[in-house]
Every structure is written in structure tokens, then in C-alpha cells.
């Protein structure tokens, strides 16, 4: 099995496992951070390839087609972890669009591939995603809503890259009298 075929298979399993647990809904935002260098067993930022980026992008687009989620591709630290998204998503949520074109050496291979393969791509600096996937320890946490909830899947690595996934939930707020699930006895004021 070639490395690319293995990466595709691992990604398919990981996304399927994730969806079984997280049940993402159409329209929710899914952020992806990825080091294609780490996928190939190299140090982050040193050996990124468009071939690996294409394979990962392709699987993520299939996941999007199946679930209706919106994708956001995190750039590398050289672009302050900005995100590549469809213009329609940026306009819908009034995300501020910034002017930059990701390239493999400043943006990363996956974000660059996404920029050249989305319908109408733009780059934004900030987002609060409903869920996400981190391939190669790229640190997507800054782009997740509070509160992040880790999701464990059967896949621990994509290629040679460590993979983590998370969904989010609303904050539990209040004090000693706060209620988090409506029950008959909590509906009326007494």
C-alpha cells in the first residue's frame, strides 16, 4: 500500500469515527490544521508536499459533501495561523478578509492547496469553529469555540503525524442553583 493510499484510508476511518461520536450538522464549521511534513515523518515546516495535501483535501471535501459542514483550512505560523475558507462562508459570518496568498513555504501545503482548489477562496484571521482536526500538532485550539471536547477515534496517526480531534459544547454557566437539563421539577418557580 502506498503512503498516499494509507493516508487516505486513515483519514476516512478517522473522520467516520469522529462523525459517529460528534454528529456534526450541516452548516457547522470544521477547522483543519495539518503538517504534511509530519504526515511524511519529517519535522513540521520542513518537507511539505502538494501530493499529500491533495489527498487530505480530497478526503475532507468528501466528508464535507457527506455531512454539509463548512471547512476552514489553517495556515502555518508564518501567516499567524490564518484560515482559508470559501468567500461565501466569510460573508455569511462577516469574517474580516485579509490580503495574502498562502504558499507552501508560508501558509503550508494543505492551506495552499485549498486556496487553489476552493471555488472562491479567501483568507481570514479568526474563526470560532464547532469542531476540528489537528494533523501533526499544528495547534487548532485558538480557532475552536469554547468549550473544546476531545474526541478519541481508532486512528492515532495520519501517516506519521499525531492526530487529535475535538468538538465543542456551550459553556455551563451559573452557580449552585443552575440547571443544565430541563426536568419537571425545575420548570416552575417555587
From Swiss-Prot:
Superkingdom of the source species: Bacteria
Cross-referenced HAMAP family: UPF0340
InterPro entries: Antibiotic_NAT-like (IPR028345), DUF436 (IPR006340)
Organism: Bacillus cereus (strain ZK / E33L)
Family statement drawn from the similarity comment of this UniProt entry: Belongs to the UPF0340 family.
Protein name per its UniProtKB record: UPF0340 protein BCE33L5016
Lineage per the UniProt record: Bacteria, Bacillati, Bacillota, Bacilli, Bacillales
Amino acid at each position: 500500500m502506498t503512503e498516499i493510499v494509507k493516508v487516505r484510508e486513515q483519514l476516512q476511518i478517522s473522520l467516520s469515527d469522529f462523525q459517529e461520536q460528534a454528529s456534526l450538522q450541516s452548516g457547522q464549521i470544521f477547522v483543519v490544521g495539518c503538517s504534511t511534513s509530519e504526515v511524511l515523518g519529517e519535522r513540521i515546516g520542513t518537507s511539505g508536499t502538494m501530493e499529500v495535501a491533495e489527498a487530505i483535501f480530497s478526503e475532507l471535501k468528501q466528508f464535507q459533501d457527506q455531512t454539509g459542514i463548512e471547512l476552514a483550512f489553517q495556515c502555518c505560523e508564518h501567516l499567524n495561523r490564518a484560515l482559508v475558507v470559501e468567500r461565501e462562508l466569510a460573508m455569511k459570518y462577516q469574517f474580516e478578509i485579509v490580503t495574502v496568498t498562502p504558499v507552501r513555504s508560508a501558509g503550508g501545503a494543505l492551506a495552499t492547496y485549498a486556496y487553489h482548489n476552493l471555488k472562491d477562496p479567501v483568507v481570514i484571521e479568526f474563526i470560532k469553529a464547532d469542531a476540528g482536526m489537528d494533523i501533526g500538532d499544528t495547534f487548532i485550539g485558538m480557532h475552536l469555540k469554547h468549550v473544546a471536547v476531545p474526541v478519541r477515534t481508532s486512528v492515532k496517526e495520519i501517516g506519521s503525524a499525531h492526530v487529535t480531534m475535538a468538538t465543542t459544547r456551550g459553556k455551563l454557566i451559573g452557580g449552585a442553583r443552575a440547571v443544565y437539563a430541563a426536568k419537571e421539577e425545575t420548570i416552575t418557580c417555587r
